[in-house]
Amino acid sequence: GEVKSPGLTQLKAGPLNAIRSGEYWLRGTVRTGPLSGEVLLASYSPTLTQQEFVGNHYQWHHQPETDGDAAFKNTSTQQFTGRLSQRLPGFADHLFEASASAVNLLNYVYYDQNGLPAQLTSSKQLLIGFARHRVRFGRFGFDNQATYTKGAENNSEALRIPALVTESRAYYQSYIFGKAMFTQVGLEFYYQSRFRGYDYSPSTQQFYLKDNFTIRNYGVASAFFVADIKAVTVFLKVPYLNQGLNGAGYFASPYYPAYPRRFQFGI
Protein backbone atom coordinates (compact mmCIF):
# COMPACT_ATOMS: atom_id res chain seq x y z
CA GLY A 1 0.00 0.00 0.00
CA GLU A 2 0.93 3.67 -0.26
CA VAL A 3 0.28 6.62 2.03
CA LYS A 4 0.58 10.34 1.29
CA SER A 5 -0.53 12.61 4.10
CA PRO A 6 0.00 15.98 5.84
CA GLY A 7 3.30 16.88 7.49
CA LEU A 8 4.68 14.76 10.32
CA THR A 9 4.17 17.55 12.86
CA GLN A 10 0.46 17.68 12.10
CA LEU A 11 0.18 13.90 12.22
CA LYS A 12 1.98 13.66 15.59
CA ALA A 13 -0.23 16.36 17.09
CA GLY A 14 -3.42 14.52 16.13
CA PRO A 15 -3.45 11.78 13.47
CA LEU A 16 -7.23 11.46 13.25
CA ASN A 17 -7.78 15.21 13.16
CA ALA A 18 -5.09 15.59 10.48
CA ILE A 19 -6.82 13.04 8.29
CA ARG A 20 -10.24 14.60 8.85
CA SER A 21 -9.21 18.20 8.13
CA GLY A 22 -6.11 17.89 5.94
CA GLU A 23 -5.15 16.29 2.67
CA TYR A 24 -4.29 12.62 2.35
CA TRP A 25 -3.90 9.89 -0.23
CA LEU A 26 -4.19 6.25 0.87
CA ARG A 27 -4.00 3.26 -1.44
CA GLY A 28 -4.04 -0.45 -0.64
CA THR A 29 -3.66 -3.28 -3.14
CA VAL A 30 -4.01 -7.05 -2.90
CA ARG A 31 -3.13 -9.54 -5.65
CA THR A 32 -3.72 -13.22 -6.23
CA GLY A 33 -2.80 -14.68 -9.60
CA PRO A 34 -4.37 -12.67 -12.43
CA LEU A 35 -6.78 -10.91 -10.05
CA SER A 36 -6.15 -7.82 -7.97
CA GLY A 37 -8.15 -5.41 -5.87
CA GLU A 38 -7.47 -1.83 -4.89
CA VAL A 39 -8.90 0.65 -2.42
CA LEU A 40 -8.14 4.36 -2.83
CA LEU A 41 -9.08 6.98 -0.25
CA ALA A 42 -8.16 10.61 -0.88
CA SER A 43 -8.94 14.10 0.33
CA TYR A 44 -7.74 17.24 -1.40
CA SER A 45 -8.46 20.96 -1.19
CA PRO A 46 -9.92 22.96 -4.09
CA THR A 47 -7.49 24.66 -6.44
CA LEU A 48 -6.43 28.23 -5.77
CA THR A 49 -8.45 29.43 -8.79
CA GLN A 50 -11.56 27.69 -7.46
CA GLN A 51 -11.11 29.39 -4.10
CA GLU A 52 -10.06 32.88 -5.15
CA PHE A 53 -10.41 34.84 -8.39
CA VAL A 54 -10.70 38.54 -9.29
CA GLY A 55 -11.11 39.56 -12.93
CA ASN A 56 -12.93 41.94 -15.24
CA HIS A 57 -15.95 39.63 -15.63
CA TYR A 58 -15.80 37.29 -12.62
CA GLN A 59 -14.76 37.38 -9.02
CA TRP A 60 -15.26 35.04 -6.08
CA HIS A 61 -13.79 34.43 -2.63
CA HIS A 62 -14.17 30.92 -1.24
CA GLN A 63 -11.16 30.79 1.09
CA PRO A 64 -11.86 30.22 4.81
CA GLU A 65 -10.04 33.34 5.99
CA THR A 66 -11.82 35.77 3.63
CA ASP A 67 -15.14 37.57 4.03
CA GLY A 68 -17.20 36.69 0.98
CA ASP A 69 -18.64 33.53 -0.49
CA ALA A 70 -18.97 30.35 1.54
CA ALA A 71 -15.66 28.55 1.99
CA PHE A 72 -15.23 25.30 0.08
CA LYS A 73 -14.60 22.05 1.92
CA ASN A 74 -12.07 19.45 0.87
CA THR A 75 -13.20 17.02 -1.81
CA SER A 76 -12.98 13.41 -0.69
CA THR A 77 -12.85 10.33 -2.92
CA GLN A 78 -13.42 6.66 -2.17
CA GLN A 79 -12.67 4.29 -5.03
CA PHE A 80 -12.86 0.49 -5.04
CA THR A 81 -11.44 -1.34 -8.06
CA GLY A 82 -11.20 -4.96 -9.14
CA ARG A 83 -8.79 -5.91 -11.95
CA LEU A 84 -8.04 -8.90 -14.16
CA SER A 85 -4.84 -9.27 -16.20
CA GLN A 86 -4.53 -12.56 -18.05
CA ARG A 87 -2.47 -13.86 -20.95
CA LEU A 88 -4.67 -15.90 -23.28
CA PRO A 89 -3.66 -19.18 -24.92
CA GLY A 90 -3.23 -19.40 -28.67
CA PHE A 91 -0.71 -19.13 -31.45
CA ALA A 92 -0.23 -15.38 -30.85
CA ASP A 93 0.80 -13.27 -27.88
CA HIS A 94 -2.51 -12.24 -26.27
CA LEU A 95 -2.98 -10.09 -23.17
CA PHE A 96 -6.45 -9.26 -21.81
CA GLU A 97 -7.03 -6.68 -19.09
CA ALA A 98 -10.30 -5.62 -17.47
CA SER A 99 -11.33 -3.59 -14.46
CA ALA A 100 -14.45 -2.37 -12.70
CA SER A 101 -14.50 0.60 -10.33
CA ALA A 102 -17.04 2.10 -7.97
CA VAL A 103 -16.29 5.73 -7.10
CA ASN A 104 -17.88 7.97 -4.48
CA LEU A 105 -17.20 11.72 -4.64
CA LEU A 106 -18.08 14.02 -1.75
CA ASN A 107 -17.96 17.84 -1.87
CA TYR A 108 -16.96 17.83 -5.54
CA VAL A 109 -16.08 21.32 -6.87
CA TYR A 110 -17.03 22.27 -10.43
CA TYR A 111 -17.91 25.31 -12.56
CA ASP A 112 -21.67 25.74 -13.00
CA GLN A 113 -23.68 26.96 -15.99
CA ASN A 114 -22.78 30.57 -15.15
CA GLY A 115 -19.06 29.85 -15.12
CA LEU A 116 -18.84 30.18 -11.32
CA PRO A 117 -17.28 27.59 -9.00
CA ALA A 118 -19.77 25.58 -6.98
CA GLN A 119 -19.61 22.63 -4.63
CA LEU A 120 -21.95 19.66 -4.59
CA THR A 121 -23.77 19.31 -1.29
CA SER A 122 -24.53 15.64 -1.95
CA SER A 123 -22.27 12.75 -2.86
CA LYS A 124 -21.86 11.56 -6.43
CA GLN A 125 -21.37 7.95 -7.51
CA LEU A 126 -19.69 6.63 -10.65
CA LEU A 127 -19.39 3.12 -12.07
CA ILE A 128 -16.50 2.65 -14.49
CA GLY A 129 -15.79 -0.41 -16.62
CA PHE A 130 -12.60 -0.83 -18.64
CA ALA A 131 -11.36 -3.55 -21.01
CA ARG A 132 -8.22 -3.85 -23.13
CA HIS A 133 -6.97 -6.56 -25.48
CA ARG A 134 -3.48 -6.59 -26.97
CA VAL A 135 -2.29 -9.19 -29.46
CA ARG A 136 0.80 -9.62 -31.62
CA PHE A 137 1.20 -11.83 -34.69
CA GLY A 138 4.90 -11.68 -35.41
CA ARG A 139 5.58 -8.10 -36.48
CA PHE A 140 1.90 -7.15 -36.60
CA GLY A 141 0.12 -5.89 -33.51
CA PHE A 142 -3.36 -4.80 -32.44
CA ASP A 143 -4.30 -2.84 -29.33
CA ASN A 144 -7.97 -2.19 -28.51
CA GLN A 145 -9.46 -0.67 -25.38
CA ALA A 146 -12.80 0.73 -24.22
CA THR A 147 -14.03 2.62 -21.16
CA TYR A 148 -17.67 2.86 -20.09
CA THR A 149 -18.78 5.28 -17.37
CA LYS A 150 -22.18 5.45 -15.68
CA GLY A 151 -23.17 8.33 -13.43
CA ALA A 152 -21.93 11.28 -15.51
CA GLU A 153 -24.68 11.43 -18.15
CA ASN A 154 -25.99 14.50 -20.00
CA ASN A 155 -28.34 15.53 -17.21
CA SER A 156 -25.84 14.76 -14.49
CA GLU A 157 -25.07 17.54 -12.06
CA ALA A 158 -21.48 18.79 -11.78
CA LEU A 159 -19.72 16.11 -13.86
CA ARG A 160 -20.36 15.11 -17.48
CA ILE A 161 -18.20 12.86 -19.64
CA PRO A 162 -18.90 10.59 -22.64
CA ALA A 163 -20.42 7.30 -21.55
CA LEU A 164 -18.29 5.32 -24.01
CA VAL A 165 -14.73 6.00 -25.17
CA THR A 166 -12.80 3.53 -27.36
CA GLU A 167 -9.31 3.50 -28.84
CA SER A 168 -7.93 1.03 -31.39
CA ARG A 169 -4.48 0.70 -32.92
CA ALA A 170 -3.10 -1.57 -35.65
CA TYR A 171 0.61 -1.43 -36.43
CA TYR A 172 3.60 -3.10 -38.06
CA GLN A 173 7.01 -2.89 -36.41
CA SER A 174 10.49 -4.10 -37.32
CA TYR A 175 14.18 -3.27 -37.35
CA ILE A 176 15.78 -1.97 -40.54
CA PHE A 177 19.31 -1.07 -41.66
CA GLY A 178 20.82 -4.00 -39.79
CA LYS A 179 18.88 -3.30 -36.59
CA ALA A 180 20.23 0.24 -36.51
CA MET A 181 16.70 1.69 -36.51
CA PHE A 182 13.48 0.41 -34.97
CA THR A 183 10.33 1.50 -36.82
CA GLN A 184 6.60 1.28 -36.22
CA VAL A 185 3.92 2.33 -38.70
CA GLY A 186 0.18 2.00 -38.29
CA LEU A 187 -3.33 3.36 -37.94
CA GLU A 188 -5.29 4.33 -34.86
CA PHE A 189 -8.94 5.17 -34.30
CA TYR A 190 -10.58 7.10 -31.46
CA TYR A 191 -14.33 7.16 -30.79
CA GLN A 192 -16.50 8.76 -28.13
CA SER A 193 -20.26 8.82 -27.62
CA ARG A 194 -22.28 12.02 -27.62
CA PHE A 195 -22.51 14.14 -24.49
CA ARG A 196 -23.18 17.69 -23.36
CA GLY A 197 -19.71 19.15 -23.41
CA TYR A 198 -18.18 21.87 -21.29
CA ASP A 199 -18.08 25.44 -22.56
CA TYR A 200 -14.89 27.48 -22.17
CA SER A 201 -14.50 30.85 -20.47
CA PRO A 202 -11.50 32.83 -21.79
CA SER A 203 -11.79 35.21 -18.84
CA THR A 204 -11.15 32.52 -16.21
CA GLN A 205 -9.55 29.96 -18.56
CA GLN A 206 -11.85 27.29 -17.13
CA PHE A 207 -14.41 24.87 -18.60
CA TYR A 208 -17.95 25.04 -17.23
CA LEU A 209 -21.26 23.20 -17.65
CA LYS A 210 -23.31 23.83 -20.79
CA ASP A 211 -26.89 22.54 -21.01
CA ASN A 212 -27.93 23.51 -24.56
CA PHE A 213 -25.07 22.11 -26.67
CA THR A 214 -24.57 18.41 -27.37
CA ILE A 215 -21.28 17.23 -28.85
CA ARG A 216 -22.21 14.43 -31.23
CA ASN A 217 -20.57 11.06 -31.26
CA TYR A 218 -17.60 11.00 -33.61
CA GLY A 219 -14.60 8.94 -34.62
CA VAL A 220 -11.12 10.15 -35.56
CA ALA A 221 -8.73 8.00 -37.64
CA SER A 222 -5.01 8.78 -37.74
CA ALA A 223 -1.87 7.39 -39.38
CA PHE A 224 1.49 7.41 -37.61
CA PHE A 225 5.15 6.50 -38.07
CA VAL A 226 7.74 6.19 -35.30
CA ALA A 227 11.47 5.56 -35.71
CA ASP A 228 14.00 5.01 -32.91
CA ILE A 229 17.64 5.61 -33.82
CA LYS A 230 19.71 4.98 -30.69
CA ALA A 231 18.77 7.87 -28.37
CA VAL A 232 16.73 9.77 -30.99
CA THR A 233 13.02 9.21 -31.66
CA VAL A 234 11.32 10.61 -34.78
CA PHE A 235 7.53 10.86 -34.73
CA LEU A 236 5.25 11.54 -37.72
CA LYS A 237 1.45 11.63 -37.57
CA VAL A 238 -1.52 12.63 -39.73
CA PRO A 239 -4.58 12.99 -37.45
CA TYR A 240 -8.19 12.99 -38.68
CA LEU A 241 -7.65 11.08 -41.93
CA ASN A 242 -11.39 10.54 -42.20
CA GLN A 243 -12.28 14.24 -42.32
CA GLY A 244 -15.00 14.79 -44.92
CA LEU A 245 -16.28 11.21 -44.87
CA ASN A 246 -18.79 11.88 -42.10
CA GLY A 247 -18.97 15.64 -41.84
CA ALA A 248 -16.38 18.35 -42.31
CA GLY A 249 -15.35 18.35 -38.66
CA TYR A 250 -16.46 18.04 -35.07
CA PHE A 251 -16.53 20.13 -31.90
CA ALA A 252 -14.05 19.54 -29.09
CA SER A 253 -16.21 21.76 -26.86
CA PRO A 254 -19.27 23.95 -27.57
CA TYR A 255 -18.51 26.35 -30.45
CA TYR A 256 -14.83 25.36 -30.45
CA PRO A 257 -14.14 23.11 -33.47
CA ALA A 258 -11.36 20.56 -33.20
CA TYR A 259 -8.25 20.74 -35.37
CA PRO A 260 -8.76 19.62 -39.00
CA ARG A 261 -6.61 17.06 -40.77
CA ARG A 262 -2.97 18.08 -40.45
CA PHE A 263 0.61 16.85 -40.33
CA GLN A 264 2.51 16.53 -37.04
CA PHE A 265 6.24 16.05 -36.69
CA GLY A 266 8.36 15.61 -33.58
CA ILE A 267 11.86 14.61 -32.49
Question: What residues fall within each predicted segment?
Answer:
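Exposed, low-structure sequence patches enriched in small/polar residues
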Residues: 1-267
